[in-house]
Amino acid sequence: SDWIALGIAEKLAREGCRVRLATTGGCAGEVIPLYIKDSWNSVLLGRGVEIIPYVRLFGADANTAYLERTVNSEHLVIDDVDTIVLAQGHVSNTELVQQLQGRKETVHVIGDCLAPRNAESAVLDGLKIGASI
């Protein structure tokens, strides 16, 4: 979800939206490799994205988001919120696999199609399948 959250935040900021990126970790993109995370955070900060670390969403109403600090349970109230975009709870898209399984003898499934996860895992999946063929 780190990749998705950073990408959506950047897209919205480029389109002129005011963006506040809340993350449960210490920084946005915490699990992304350091060289990418730092570069991407620089882009986001340069576009005016406000990054709010160590929080989780616990409620919302018409124009307010209610966050809770994951490290001390402090509550934060974020006003003037038009839209909340969640980058969590991903589900694999196996539609293509299902179509191919009836047409091909062997179908290898990798990446997010196999299970929602990071890009490095998808590359490793591809390497393993490629080496086994």
PLM region spans:
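A Rossmann-like FAD-binding core segment of flavoenzymes
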Residues: 14-99, 103
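A conserved FAD-binding loop/helix module that cradles the flavin
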Residues: 2-11, 15, 27-33, 95, ...
